[in-house]
From Swiss-Prot:
The lineage of its organism: Eukaryota, Metazoa, Chordata, Craniata, Vertebrata. Its main location: cytoplasm. It comes from Cricetulus longicaudatus. This is DNA dC->dU-editing enzyme APOBEC3. The gene is APOBEC3. Homodimer. Zn(2+) binds at H71, C105, C108, H255, C283, C286.
Length: 396
């Protein structure tokens, strides 16, 4: 499913339980334990502010609790649609801050991602006391997608606990209520979250220079350390911000191209343009899987740039490349503009890319090699036709 307005899809309106919660409730449900037995309810303390001449103006604050199987964050989205978006101008800019007892589950995170994708004028900060089911790969993936959609996702530290306590907890003189081991538990929760988010981080500069290096290496041991990376950027025709990601094939597991296909299928998108940067061109199996995926989605535009050709002298690998061209996938060799774009989008946009010696010479040499493969299989005219297609939204 594509992005949608969650509130428009549901008529039932949820309301905050109150503006404040008791100290006992906060101490029990917001305690940032590594193992939190008996804490099945989800609590969400929220504040909504609006920009007014560049100064934030507080509009609403309160507390949500789950309603049966409907988690607190989804209750908030329904309420926000009915009580804020329907009343105020849809063009106003809002900042939403959440303090949550549990981080979103993968289903709620998916709905939050889609809500943010529909409402570009919203900014969302999510501070969680504890991480929910983060061993689950789908949960990890959707937490990363929240960040990619522009949300700030963080564990509650002492500063955030104090802010939440001061604004949302009924006060009793002389009782700080924050308890012992808060900082120790925060470091535990934060380390787990950062480990998850690092997996979606752009490549390090060192990794980029070593893995996307397009020249022949002298030492075989170094050659085998070159890993199959796939960096992708997905652009939709509805004006939404591009989605980016970087995938790595792990030894003995699925190749990065298959991981990429699984990810794109889960989004159920159409009429998109996807640009991929690969360290190695696809193997025959991955090439055929990519070709089948493209044939099933004629509106999708997929352009693959590769730094190096993988076993290009073997006919099965050449045939795999041919299947990509025949399906309408554009396959090219990375040159200086592509290396620069990959660096900017996936490594470090604040620092310039410094090309290594001989980059463009080797790129042209690899391009000639790829062109000879096209010609030997009689595909040059077909590839030229695909290359002349307009890359953009369908004409109305």
């Amino acid at each position: 499913m594509g992005p949608f307005c969650l509130g428009c899809s549901h008529r039932k309106c949820y309301s905050p339980i109150r503006n404040l919660i008791s100290q006992e409730t906060f101490k029990f449900h917001f305690k940032n334990l590594g193992y939190a037995k008996g804490r099945k309810d989800t609590f969400l303390c929220y504040e909504v502010t609006r920009k007014d001449c560049d100064s934030p103006v507080s509009l609403h604050h309160g507390v949500f609790k789950n309603k049966g199987n409907i988690h607190a964050e989804v209750c908030f989205l329904y309420w926000f649609h009915d009580k804020v978006l329907k009343v105020l101008s849809p063009r106003e800019e809002f900042k939403i801050t959440w303090y949550m007892s549990w981080s979103p589950c993968f289903e709620c995170a998916e709905q939050i991602v889609r809500f943010l994708a529909t409402h570009h004028y919203l900014s969302l900060d999510i501070f969680s006391s504890r991480l929910y089911n983060v061993q689950d790969p789908e949960t990890q993936q959707n937490l990363c997608r929240l960040v990619q959609e522009g949300a700030q996702v963080a564990a509650m530290d002492l500063y955030e606990f104090k802010k939440c306590w001061k604004k949302f907890v009924t006060m009793v003189a002389g009782d700080s209520g924050l308890g012992k081991r808060l900082l120790t538990n925060f470091r535990y929760q934060d380390s787990k979250l950062q480990e998850i988010l690092r997996r979606m981080d752009p490549l390090s500069e060192e990794e980029f220079y070593s893995q996307f290096y397009n020249q022949r290496v002298k030492h075989l041991c170094y050659y085998h350390r070159m890993k199959p990376y796939l960096c992708y950027q997905l652009e939709q025709f509805n004006g939404q911000a591009p989605l980016k990601g970087c995938l790595l094939s792990e030894k003995g597991k699925q190749h990065a191209e298959i991981l990429f296909l699984d990810k794109i299928r889960s989004m159920e998108l159409s009429q998109v343009t996807i640009t991929c940067y690969l360290t190695w061109s696809p193997c025959p199996n991955c090439a055929w899987r990519l070709a089948a995926f493209k044939r099933d989605r004629p509106d999708l535009i997929l352009h693959i740039y590769t730094s190096r050709l993988y076993f290009h002298w073997k006919r099965p690998f050449q045939k795999g490349l041919c299947s990509l061209w025949q399906s309408g996938i554009l396959v090219d060799v990375m040159d200086l503009p592509q290396f620069t774009d990959c660096w900017t989008n996936f490594v470090n946009p604040k620092r310039p890319f410094w090309p290594w010696k001989g980059l463009e010479i080797i790129s042209r040499r690899t391009q000639r090699r790829l062109r000879r493969i096209k010609e030997s299989w009689g595909l040059q005219d077909l590839v030229n036709d695909f290359g002349n297609l307009q890359l953009g939204p369908p004409m109305s």
